[in-house]
């Protein structure tokens, strides 16, 4: 077996015995591979450092040019604020973008309260006040009376009317609650609805047959109560339902007397618009106009007193 030297394998030359490296590929013969490798190494040693430095500088220059071009394009693309309309458009776009980003919190509806245990009277009355319909329904479903009351003879209907809990009022009336049930001061449900300023409840009560002329212990009608408490919508509805504009309470005061005494301008205008009597006298012999003059003179006296005191204080300060 013929043994070849490494030199002969690389160069492809014949050995001393005259055997040729015929098994080598053609491009590796006659020393071409060796010469090519040597030349390649020499070229690398000469050109690599210079080329790498040059390429790095060119790359940095091109990056700077690219950045400058991008900045120029961005400046050109920016909208110019030529008028207030442009500014308003930009503000609206920013608001819209901010609105899209903000997440709307999902509010979970409270689960309906399931009542299993019996409900006593105090809890039932409190539930009517606090608008807890399941508690009220449980009490009524156990065949209890809807007209149970507290120590002041106030029923669940009175409490619900005061707070304006329409669903509970409807439920109590379906269960047979008495609309004309009177508390210790002989107020009925419509008195309590007007006291709370709940026009929707008042309308429901009147539609169900509540007496618009009902009076309490002070002989006040629901219109008296609405005027005193300043609930305009309730007073307006009562007048539309033909409530007595000139009804007198125990002191002989009409709703207009009360409106003037409490200086409720809108109520005065409402009552006068629908024909309230300006000349009717109360038990003290005073008409609504007399009360106006009395109020004006009283106010004038207060202002005169304040002016006089201010004048005296200013004279003392000068000494």
Swiss-Prot record:
Q: Which organism is it from?
A: Mus musculus
**What is known about its subunit structure?**
Interacts with TTN/titin and YBX1.
What this protein is called in its record is: Ankyrin repeat domain-containing protein 1
GO terms in the biological process aspect are: cardiac muscle tissue morphogenesis; cellular response to interleukin-1; cellular response to lipopolysaccharide; cellular response to mechanical stimulus; cellular response to transforming growth factor beta stimulus; cellular response to tumor necrosis factor; cellular response to xenobiotic stimulus; negative regulation of DNA biosynthetic process
Per its UniProt record, what PANTHER family does this chain match? Answer: ANKYRIN REPEAT DOMAIN-CONTAINING PROTEIN 1, ANKYRIN REPEAT, PH AND SEC7 DOMAIN CONTAINING PROTEIN SECG-RELATED
Where composition is biased (Basic and acidic residues), the residues are 55-65
Q: In which tissues is it expressed?
A: Expressed in heart, cardiac muscle.
**Per the record's keyword annotation, is Plastid included, yes or no?**
no
The segments carrying the ANK repeats are: 152-181, 185-214, 218-247, 251-280, 284-315
Q: What's the chief localization of this chain?
A: nucleus
Provide the coiled-coil residue spans.
53-89
Instruction: Please give one Gene Ontology molecular function term for this protein.
Output: histone deacetylase binding
Q: Give a short account of what the protein does.
A: May play an important role in endothelial cell activation. May act as a nuclear transcription factor that negatively regulates the expression of cardiac genes.
Q: Which InterPro entries match?
A: Ankyrin_rpt, Ankyrin_rpt-contain_sf
Q: GO CC: one term?
A: protein-containing complex
Q: List the PROSITE patterns hit by this protein, alphabetically.
A: ANK_REP_REGION, ANK_REPEAT
Q: Where in the cell is it found?
A: Nucleus
Instruction: Kindly state which keywords UniProt assigns to this record, in alphabetical order.
Output: ANK repeat, Coiled coil, Nucleus, Repeat
Q: Could you confirm whether the keyword Nucleotide-binding appears in this record? A: no
- Tell me the segments the record calls region Disordered: 46-65
């Amino acid at each position: 077996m013929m043994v070849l030297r490494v030199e002969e394998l690389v160069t492809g030359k014949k050995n001393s015995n005259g055997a040729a490296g015929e098994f080598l590929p053609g491009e590796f013969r006659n020393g071409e591979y060796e010469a090519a490798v040597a030349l390649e190494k020499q070229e690398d040693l000469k050109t690599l450092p210079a080329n790498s430095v040059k390429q790095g500088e060119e790359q940095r220059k091109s990056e700077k040019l690219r950045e400058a071009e991008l900045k120029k394009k961005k400046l050109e693309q920016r909208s110019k604020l030529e008028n207030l309309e442009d500014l308003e458009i930009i503000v609206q776009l920013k608001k819209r973008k901010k609105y899209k980003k903000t997440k709307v919190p999902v509010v979970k509806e409270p689960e309906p309260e399931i009542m299993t245990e019996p409900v006593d009277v105090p809890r039932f009355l409190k539930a009517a006040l606090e608008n807890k319909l399941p508690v009220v329904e449980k009490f009524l479903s156990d065949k209890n009376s809807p007209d149970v009351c507290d120590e002041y003879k106030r029923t669940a209907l009175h409490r619900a009317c005061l707070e304006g809990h329409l669903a509970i009022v409807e439920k109590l009336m379906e269960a047979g609650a008495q609309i004309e049930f009177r508390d210790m001061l002989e107020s009925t449900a419509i008195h309590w609805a007007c006291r709370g300023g709940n026009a929707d409840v008042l309308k429901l009560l009147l539609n169900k047959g509540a007496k618009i002329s009902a009076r309490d212990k002070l002989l006040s009608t629901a219109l008296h109560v609405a005027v005193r408490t300043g609930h305009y919508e309730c007073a307006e509805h009562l007048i539309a339902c033909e409530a007595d504009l000139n009804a007198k309470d125990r002191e002989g005061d009409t709703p207009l007397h009360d409106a003037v005494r409490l200086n409720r301008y809108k109520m005065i205008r409402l009552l006068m618009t629908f024909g309230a009597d300006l000349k009717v006298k109360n038990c003290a012999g005073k008409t609504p106009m007399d009360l106006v003059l009395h109020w004006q003179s009283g106010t004038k006296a207060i202002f005169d007193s304040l002016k006089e005191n201010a004048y005296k204080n200013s004279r003392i300060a000068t000494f």
